[in-house]
Amino acid sequence: MEKHQIKTITFEDDGNIPNNPFHPLILYPGALDHPDNCMKIFKENNWTNAWENGVFSYHHYHSNSHEVLGVIKGEASITFGGENGKTVEVTVGDVVVIPAGVGHKKEASSTDFRVVGAYPAGMPHDLRTGKADERKDAIDNIKNVPLPATDPIFGVNGPLLDVWGR
């Protein structure tokens, strides 16, 4: 996959979901030629603490870590950025890098929809839902999340490092 094939989406703070003021979400359509190798590819590029499952059907975000999702089965409609965000159709082979603070919610999916999720250098991650009492800490956390050292698909030469800065 060529770097120019990525898509980026920027989200503003919506009052509930802070989103990320520094980095856009990055979509890699069809990046996984062999979706069964997704977890291995992420691990080789030091995106670890991986899991395989679906995506929650409520708005949520992680304030203390970026996250990558690789679609390994099925397809889904996922809204990123909170209630007024953007709904994106994802399918087998697609990869999405979600910056810390960016909300995501599964709106609909095929019955076989599965993703692999992972975090740069296996960073621990919290789960936030946009409650008022979590907002101040979440915003402080987002400001302090380090840049990943590698792109989850392409390693040290990947487009994530160009888009988010080195």
Region locations from a protein language model:
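Conserved metal-binding segment of the jelly-roll/cupin
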Residues: 90-110, 119
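A short, N-terminal "cap"/entry segment at the start of jelly-roll beta-barrel domains
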Residues: 1-59, 161-166
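Double-stranded beta-helix
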Residues: 107-166
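Short alpha-helix capping/helix-loop boundary micro-motifs
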Residues: 81-85
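Short, conserved beta-strand element in jelly-roll/cupin
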Residues: 62-79, 97
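Short, conserved, surface-exposed binding loops centered on an aromatic residue
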Residues: 18, 60-62, 68-70, 88, ...
